[in-house]
Amino acid sequence: MDLVNHLPDRLLFAVPKKGRLYEKCCNLLSGADIQFRRSNRLDIALSTNLPIALIFLPAADIPVFVGEGNCDLGITGLDQIKEAEQFDNIEDLLDLKFGSCKLQIQVPADGEYEKPEQLVGKKIVSSFTKLSTDYFKQLSDKPTNIRYVGGSVEASCALGVADAIVDLVESGETMKAAGLKAIETILETSAHLISSKKSKFPEMVNIIVQRLQGVLAAQEYVLCNYNAPKSIQAKCLTITPGRRAATVSTLDKHSDDEEDWVAISSMVNRKEIGNVMDELKKAGATDILVLEISNCRV
């Protein structure tokens, strides 16, 4: 079935059908209010509130489908985009800040190899043969034997298939359990939102980008509200400058107030909020509140 012609009024959005990115993609789409129900046996789901069809594909195939214009949008790893050589055919719209891992060269922990240069001309196993080949070509003109394996790459050294592997690593625990250690990082990767340069739905693409940016901002920031004497306003604003700027309002002056007061509201990186609250209190701010941001547009 040619979905491009079968669903002419819907933007085709490719997302990973399983694996490390699938669940987080679904959570991201839910946060962006892209509503859908997926049958267990189908790799197509129609959005119930937007003119979008979600196409569930292997992450490695998504850059090709988007790059060739078969899908308008896609979510996949930066590693897969580079491996598929599709950067000339797609727009890299957003780093989605999840699925972070490293494409590393791993060797037996008790072996002789300590530097990548020692592996030139040896047997390397990887699911990323293009990236691996490019890396070793930069090291030497001498050819390196790079073989493709689709899964369980970490077992290759123990089985005698390879002298080293090139594979994605998150925590590194799987590699340690397989008796491997990292000697080089080829690429740091995460999930990215990409679009086809041939998309017929630029307005819907922009809407989705704005929604996803809002979800990411809501995950990254909290809203910090507090009151402060006007005399320390400038100092407080250096502590909470806001994402673009803080919102400052004048408070009604009570009869027993010796000076004017202001209410300040500012977006603060959630990783820094504890220190920010301590600094505000030390500066003389009061009534310091932190509120979650469920969603926003930035």
UniProtKB/Swiss-Prot annotation:
This is ATP phosphoribosyltransferase. GO terms for molecular function: ATP binding; ATP phosphoribosyltransferase activity; magnesium ion binding. GO terms for biological process: L-histidine biosynthetic process. It comes from Candida albicans (strain SC5314 / ATCC MYA-2876) (Yeast). Its EC number is 2.4.2.17. Keywords: Amino-acid biosynthesis, ATP-binding, Cytoplasm, Glycosyltransferase, Histidine biosynthesis, Nucleotide-binding, Transferase. It catalyses: 1-(5-phospho-beta-D-ribosyl)-ATP + diphosphate = 5-phospho-alpha-D-ribose 1-diphosphate + ATP. Pfam families: HisG (PF01634), HisG_C (PF08029). Its main location: cytoplasm. Coiled coil: none annotated. Gene3D superfamilies: 3.30.70.120, Periplasmic binding protein-like II. It is found in: Cytoplasm. Pathway: Amino-acid biosynthesis; L-histidine biosynthesis; L-histidine from 5-phospho-alpha-D-ribose 1-diphosphate: step 1/9. GO terms for cellular component: cytoplasm. It is an enzyme of class 2 (transferase). Catalyzes the condensation of ATP and 5-phosphoribose 1-diphosphate to form N'-(5'-phosphoribosyl)-ATP (PR-ATP). Has a crucial role in the pathway because the rate of histidine biosynthesis seems to be controlled primarily by regulation of the enzymatic activity. Belongs to the ATP phosphoribosyltransferase family.
